[in-house]
Every structure is written in C-alpha cells, then in structure tokens.
Amino acid sequence: MAQASLLACEGLAGVSLVPTAASKKMMLSQIASKQAENGERAGSPDVLRCSSQGHRKDSDKSRSRKDDDSLSEASHSKKTVKKVVVVEQNGSFQVKIPKNFVCEHCFGAFRSSYHLKRHILIHTGEKPFECDICDMRFIQKYHLERHKRVHSGEKPYQCERCHQCFSRTDRLLRHKRMCQGCQSKTSDGQFSL
C-alpha cells in the first residue's frame, strides 16, 4: 500500500478509506492537481488526515510527536474497532470490518473475539444453555429462548396477508414464499383469480 492514498477522518473514528486499484489513479491525480493549485510539491502522500482546517499531510511538521504517539495508542486499543472504507472508481464506497479473529480448528475468520468464542462451541460440542422443561441444550441463549416457544405455544410472528401465526421468523418467511393462497388474497380476505 505504499502508493495507495489513505484517508483517515477525525469524524469517522477508526475508519480508513482504502481506494480500489481502479480508483487509485483517479484519486492520486485529484490529490496531485489539488497540490499544484496550492503550490505544494507534486507527489502523492501515503496518508492524509482530515482536520477542521482542511487536509493535513503526514509530511506536515505542525503535528507533534506526542500527537503521533497518542494516535498510535488509540489505533492499538482493544476497544477500537478498525473499519476500512473501500472507495470504488465511481465514487461509491463500502464500510468493511476486518475479520481478525481466526478459528484454529477450521480457519474461519470472525470480526470479534465474542463471535470466535461462540463459534468454537461448535467444535467442542459444548452447549451451555439448557431447557428446563425438556433438557435440550443449545449453543446460544437466543436459540434456547426461541425453543421455549414450542413449550409455551407463543407465536409472535404473524403474516399480514392471511393472519396465520408462527413461532419463528424463518417459518414466517418460508410461509410467505411458499403459500400461493397467501400471495393471491386481496385486502378484504377474498381470493383473486
């Protein structure tokens, strides 16, 4: 990434803009033309920082070493979530969170240590959440809560067309895709031909 131009804005804490290969040339040419307008030397900075006064290049001497050290410490903080913004040639962009936590069993990658720990339960077979009625066990608390609806008979998800109720959202979505009668009903409850 020596030639890539990265933008890190104070307004977007922990976010870096990373241009794609196609957009690098366009972005670098825009930076070079802006530098020429301002009477600055030609060339592309590796990193641009946004400030309330405008853009600031890494080569600027106005920033102290203390500022650099505090920036470095903030970027290595465990609570800081790094986000990468990928800029396309047409100007659109996507925010991506790198998957830095890797499972040693299957090499699956995850965005947080929580998600990795939850995933490892699949490999260990551990199911810490147990139903107090039927002794079924689950990896996630949400799955246990969803299972308990079987015993209680609760069906909180309702089809807005035919008013049939379901205990799970995936069952409601399947119903909406599969039920032809539901799709052809009119608002007054009559079937249309």
Swiss-Prot record:
SMART domains in the cross-refs:
ZnF_C2H2
| BP GO annotations | regulation of transcription by RNA polymerase II
* One Pfam family from the record: zf-C2H2
Positions of C2H2-type zinc fingers: 101-123, 129-151, 157-179
Q: Which UniProt keywords apply?
A: Isopeptide bond, Metal-binding, Nucleus, Phosphoprotein, Repeat, Transcription, Transcription regulation, Ubl conjugation, Zinc, Zinc-finger
**Organism domain of life:** Eukaryota
Show the ranges annotated as biased composition (Basic and acidic residues): 55-69
Q: Which segments carry the region annotation Disordered?
A: 33-75
The name of this protein is: Zinc finger protein 740
In its UniProt entry, the species of origin is given as Homo sapiens (Human)
